[in-house]
Amino acid sequence: MPSIIVFDFDGVIVDSNEVRMNGFIRLYQNRYPWAIDEYRRYLRLNSGLSRYKKIEYFYENILRIEPELMILTKDAEDYSSIVTSDVIKAPFIDGSIDFIKKNINRFEYAMISSSNQLELIKICMSRDIDKYFTEILGSPIEKNKNIERFIRNKNAIKSEIVYVGDTKYDEIAALNSGISFIGFGQKSEFSQTEKVVNTYAELEKILH
């Protein structure tokens, strides 16, 4: 039985995956309209990657140019400006906050996401949910490194931690870090775990 639950954010706590994807489209649609359809297909298949990797991919694999660091940094900042207010307003995943409040004395909660860390903290504070999480970690540090950092900082026992995420990248990061994983969403997204839930009611059952 785990004593610590590590949550992803987008698609697990808040229904914001579409907001995030549309932010990338808005970032480039005026400058590179001919590239948007291909980029949208890529984004749908890779929602769990950080914005830095998605921006790099756009330049290197779709535009086929080597971008300067200054351009990547500016695009990441512009992307944040586009999406932050919409993510703050996005609805919670049904049952997420009820689950967290109900089980606050049962589990310690942390949040480790591929979203930018400073932006993520700002969003959580604006939504008044930062108080539920002992750690809120994000990019540009990669997710598996943040998981390992969390384990070290807490001196936690790996067998007592479970990560709840909605993408194959969450699954890979958790399992490569030696902690358990529960998929949230479509079973077809995950290749290495049998524990997949679609609702917080199902998550509660699986954790009993």
Name each model feature, range by range.
Residues 19, 50, 91, 95, ...:
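Short beta->alpha linker loops
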Residues 44-46:
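A short helix-loop-helix "switch/interaction" segment in the helical subdomain of ASCE P-loop NTPases
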Residues 12, 24, 96-124, 137-139:
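Substrate-recognition element of Asp-dependent hydrolases with the DxDx(T/V) motif
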Residues 59-95, 107:
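Metal-dependent phosphoesterase signature
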